[in-house]
Amino acid sequence: MSSVRAQFAEVQEQLNQVHSLVDSNTPSDLNKAATILKSLLPVYKDLSGNEESKRPENLEILKEIKSRLTEETQRVMSKKEEAKSLQIQQQQQQQQLLQQQQQQQILESTTRNRQASQQELPKPPILSGYLKKQGDKGLVRSFKKRWFLQRDTKLFYYEKEGDSEPYGFVNLPEMINVKTVDSGFELATPSRVYVFQVFKPSDLTYWTEGLKEFKKYYQSLQNSQKFGANANGNGNSSPNMSSSGSYSDFRKYSESSQQPLNSSTGAINTTPQRGTPIKDRRGTVSGGTTEYSHSSSSTAPDSPTLSSSYVPPPSSSNLNPQDEELKRRENEIIRKHQEKLKQQDDQQQDDKQQQQQQSQEPPQQQQQQQEQLQSQPSQQQQQQQQQQQQQQQQQQQQQQQQQQQQQQQQQQPPQTSPQNSRHGSTNYSQLQQQQQQPQQQPQQQSSPQVIISNNNSPRFESQQQQNNFHNNGSNINLESFRQSIEDELNKKFLKEKQDLMEFEIKKRLEIESEIKKLQLQLDQTKTDAEEKQNKSSNELKKKKAEIEDYEARVTIITKRNEEMDAKIKELESSRPVETFPHEFLWTEEVNSRDLLIASQSKRILELEEQLKLKDNAVTVIKRENEMLRQETEKKDKYINELLEKGGGSGIHTNSNNNNNSNNNNNNSNNNSNTDKIKESMVAHQTQNAFLLQEIQRLETQSQFKLDIKIQQIEELENQLEQQLYQFHRFREAIIGTMSNEYCVKIEKENLDVKKEYFQSLGVSIKLHRVKEGYFANIDINSLFDKVIKENVHYRNWPEWISNQFNQA
């Protein structure tokens, strides 16, 4: 026994350990609990197979152990399932978080790139103001005053400020370059060169810098958009060269400039060549010569021939090495652009083939190809940027070479008369303006500009003078040329000085305005501080007055509390012992009915007890009847056995009458015994029948009594319900709809009185402590709720409130 009990104790201790491990709800503890349960299973099998454990004392312990084993195994399994589900949820959440983080990183990177691209060049201001615009029609192009206003990417110009209908506009995205000239600036586009003059020198910087900022901003926007249209196969043109057609025009123009002069045609071809410098009326110097081919005598009979003054174009063998290098570079640029166009065409064809394949390929391969296509525009952008940089470097080199040529040519200038030089320079400057337009517009002109003039025109005379200017070999006066350059430089220096003075004046005015603003801010801060001081002093005065009012109220409340305490004491002394006062007449009736209800409930309990006793007696009688029936059955069986034995013995005697005469006496005795047994059997049967009748009579009597008692109980219950209903109706008529409403009203009134008393006590104690210099921010209403929860007596409230303030 001791060994089995010890095993039971060990198993229970291990089960307690398993319970504690499962409660800890950690994976290591759950694994330990599972191992312990596995080790307990064979122990439980051994205990259940042991005979000592099958005893009634140990069976209950075994059942408890079995139930606990099942419970703990179920708990361990449930905890493991919960842990697995939590791990799965955590993994899913981690995956979702990783996906969200990746998406956020992608979005942040895109937003950063966009913000960086937008923050590199802030949005330029809107340009507006009056300018003088040069006309585009007629030989003498005059300047007219116009009001310019920028709207989005277009610069509209009106007759005056406030007009609604513009004369025209300049498309700013097509702007190639902005260059300053005398008292103005030039704005070059592929279709035209706009010349503007400024009223003030400050306006010059305003317009030039504003236009340059807009150009930078527009280029940055184009780069930030990542050439979305090019990714779809619509072309990869750079911002400077918008289409292949514009560059093809430039190619045709360059090829026509390289061809020799066609003498058979009757038109006059003006093709710019690298040659002698020409001084423009705006102060700029550009290189170039004009080539003329006059028609036959049938077209112009009165015109003189140009054989004496005409200089043929230099052949390729007589060209300077600088000109050869320039032409070679131009040819290289054209060749590169042609190769680029071929690459673009090949790429477009490849893109079309890829799109056809994508329609047949699965969606995964389509996604991969889309990613590759998205990566292609960035590579194309890099290639275009590199090509643009190369072109810019080549243009800079060309400009440097032109400047060197101009310096060389200025050192050996021809000499002519001052009148011819002036007249030629004025007329030749107009011709140079017409020649500069095809140079600045090589992308949209498919053939060089053609000018047809008569012999008597001043333009033709200026051209003759210019040819004489080149052929006679006359020299310009160096001193006049130097003086003109010095005058121009002095003018520029004066303009720069004026600009600097205006800039300094603006800065001084801005600084003075800022100083005034700071002084105003200081004055405002001083006034605000004074106002705050006045407000704080007024608030302090108001608070002092409020404290005095509170003190007066506290004194009044304390007096009222003292009076209330006295009244409460009087009421407590005069309060009767009974639950309700004697003034109400209905209280006696209520009490009497309550007594009746209590007495009837007691009577019902007594009747139920009597019924239980009678039920027990009936069960006892039934048991006795069953015992009697069993005895009668046994007696009947015994009698039947005896009868069977007596009949057998009679047959045996009849067969042996002849042999044994001495057995006659025995037979007679046996017959007498059978008769007695029959009589006794009949007596028993009659007795049994009588007993059965009595049992039936008793059962009917008990059943009748039970029915009577059940009827009595039902009647009493009905009477109780009626009396309770009448009682509640009576109380509702006197007190109200609810039976507890009167008591609830009294309790509410008591709570209101207690709350007012508690608030007055709290305010008085708080003000007293404030006077002494102890401040505490405590809500008195919350303290009242706490007092009611703790069931503190109202006489102990002052001490309790002071303790709460001390704790705070």
From Swiss-Prot:
GO molecular function, one term: phosphatidylinositol-3,4-bisphosphate binding
Any matching Pfam family: PH_3
Coiled coil listed as a keyword: yes
InterPro entries: Mediator_comp_sub12, PDK1-typ_PH, PH-like_dom_sf, PH_domain
Ranges where the PH domain occurs: 124-216
Biological process according to GO: endosome organization; protein localization to phagocytic vesicle; receptor recycling; regulation of phagosome maturation; retrograde transport, endosome to Golgi
Top-level division of the source organism's lineage: Eukaryota
Compositional bias annotation for Polar residues: 108-120, 255-274, 417-428, 450-475
GO annotation, cellular component aspect: cytosol; early endosome; early phagosome; macropinosome; recycling endosome; trans-Golgi network
Alphabetical keyword list: Coiled coil
Keyword DNA repair annotated: no
Basic and acidic residues bias: start-end ranges: 339-353, 525-542
Residue ranges that the Swiss-Prot or TrEMBL entry lists as coiled coil: 57-121, 322-412, 487-645, 678-734
Positions of the UniProt region annotated as Disordered: 108-127, 228-325, 339-375, 405-475, 523-542, 645-675
Bias (Low complexity): 228-248, 293-321, 354-375, 405-414, 429-449, 654-673
Protein name: PH domain-containing protein DDB_G0275795
Source organism per UniProt: Dictyostelium discoideum (Social amoeba)
UniProt lineage: Eukaryota, Amoebozoa, Evosea, Eumycetozoa, Dictyostelia
